[in-house]
Regions:
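N-terminal nucleotide-binding beta1-loop-alpha1 segment
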Residues: 11-17
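Short acidic, Gly/Ser-rich segments with clustered Asp/Glu that frequently serve as metal-coordination loops
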Residues: 19-23
Length: 179
């Protein structure tokens, strides 16, 4: 059974939005825009934001608009971030709802989602904030993640669920971000 996303239980995980990778991502500008929007909303709502960077010496640093919004960045060499002890340690924060976005959808994002699910974690995959070089790879990743047990959400769906209602103290600020 699916539950509404809960800001008090959430951690936002931004996978590998890096300088040399983003220019080759299909609809990369939209992926980045959605990622920035979610990271800003997470900041307003007190949701931890963890980033990963796959071999930054080869793929570049996390892109500046995202880097400025991260609470922590974990460098990695494995495609599945769960294979990195610092990543798993960062998730020991008492929050059990892991919201994943980033690139590439069919490699590091998918393997991290599968790794989290294997570890019995609750995972939400943000469909409009993930990307691959080819759209068909992104769609295959969404299908596989869903079949494995991840819930597929959109960025706006997520933000409105995080707030719960229009009386939320940050509603106006987040609405302004969305529009």
């Amino acid at each position: 059974m699916s539950y509404l996303c809960d800001a008090s239980r959430a951690t936002l995980i931004i996978v590998d939005l890096q300088e040399k990778l983003m220019p080759v991502i299909d609809d990369g500008a939209l992926v980045l825009q959605r990622a920035v929007l979610l990271a800003q909303a997470a900041g307003l709502l007190g949701i931890p934001v963890i980033g990963t960077a796959q071999q930054p010496l080869r793929l570049g640093r996390t892109v500046a608009p995202i880097d400025a919004l991260l609470d922590r960045t974990i460098e990695k060499t494995s495609f599945d971030a769960c294979a990195q002890a610092p990543f798993m340690a960062a998730l020991c924060n008492g929050r059990d709802e892991l919201v994943v976005l980033g690139c590439e959808a069919h490699v590091c994002v998918l393997q991290t989602v599968l790794g989290l699910l294997h570890r019995q974690r609750r995972v939400k995959l943000v469909s409009d904030a993930i990307g691959s070089r080819r759209g068909s790879d992104k769609q295959a990743a969404i299908g596989r993640a869903c079949a494995a047990g991840a819930e597929i959400v959109s960025s706006e769906m997520l933000m409105f669920e995080w707030m719960g209602n229009s009386d939320h103290p940050e509603f106006r600020k987040i609405l302004k971000l969305i529009k």
